[in-house]
């Protein structure tokens, strides 16, 4: 998927991703959201109990490393739960974007077709900074209500602490857990998985040199955590390793599964 725009969560340039040629629907959606990025995967979806149509809404924390949703769907294909023909995922991202900035496009994209799940990722500081925390919560409430009205399940993407700022883990955990409980919405504890790997295996860098954005291993860990949370199944042993090697991939798979279980049992 080609990307256009700046590679920074702090930038303001929108990005547009694609897989193959644009379909008219993608063009219309891209115009409708006025600068948000959309990436497309497979089109024909078979009905089923497990979520097959998933929209990821966020910023560069989502689209780095050729996009979280691509690694996630490769895990689902490797598991045998879905194939490219019966699963569909997209991203809607704004570089440097806070969750409220998606207000212009969220409902348009959600109404363009049926989604089983919409994943919402706030700015890395948005839920925990004075001046942005309440707008984050207001947007979360509004977007969750819009989602449910259209039969889509809202899910929140708990992000991770910056390098050298471990206190962010607790702050983000509390912020996302609180909004998840308030709205009775699932929270995927990616940030807690990051904290575990950072403590146990500092030889596996999860962030790039800026200390914020995910490395390939970080994006893969996030994808494994989403797989574990959304499907309530362990990703351990899945053959897709994103080029990280079997040993590293297996460790990240194990951490993802354990983190999701521990978080659910708190």
Go through each PLM region and give its residues.
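Conserved catalytic region of serine esterases and O-acyltransferases that act on ester linkages
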Residues: 38, 213, 223-266
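Bacterial N-terminal signal peptides that target proteins for export
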Residues: 4-24
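A short, charged/proline- and glycine-enriched loop
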Residues: 48-52
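Bacterial Sec-dependent signal peptides at the C-terminal "C-region" and cleavage site
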Residues: 33-47
């Amino acid at each position: 998927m080609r990307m256009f725009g700046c590679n920074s969560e702090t930038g303001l340039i929108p990005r547009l991703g694609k897989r193959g040629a644009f379909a008219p629907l993608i063009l219309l959606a891209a115009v409708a959201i006025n600068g948000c990025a959309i990436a497309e995967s497979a089109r024909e979806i078979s009905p089923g109990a497990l979520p097959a149509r998933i929209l990821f809404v966020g910023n560069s924390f989502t689209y780095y490393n050729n996009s979280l949703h691509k690694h996630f769907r490769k895990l689902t294909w490797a598991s045998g739960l879905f194939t490219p023909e019966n699963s569909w995922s997209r991203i809607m991202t704004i570089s440097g974007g806070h969750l409220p900035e998606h207000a212009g496009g969220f409902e348009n994209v959600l109404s363009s077709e049926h989604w089983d799940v919409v994943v919402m990722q706030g700015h890395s500081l948005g839920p925990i900074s004075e001046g942005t925390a309440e707008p984050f919560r207001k947007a979360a409430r509004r977007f969750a209500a819009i989602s449910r009205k259209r039969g889509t399940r809202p899910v929140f993407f708990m992000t991770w602490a910056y390098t050298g700022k471990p206190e962010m883990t607790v702050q983000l955990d509390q912020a996302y857990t609180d909004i998840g409980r308030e709205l009775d919405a699932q929270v995927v504890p990616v940030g807690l998985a990051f904290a575990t790997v950072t403590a146990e295996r500092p030889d596996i860098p999860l962030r790039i040199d800026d200390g914020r954005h995910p490395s390939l291993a970080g994006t893969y860990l996030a994808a494994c955590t989403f797989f574990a949370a959304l499907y309530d199944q362990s990703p351990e042993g899945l053959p897709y390793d994103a080029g990280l090697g079997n040993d590293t991939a297996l460790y990240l798979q194990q951490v993802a599964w354990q983190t999701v279980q521990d978080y659910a049992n708190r």
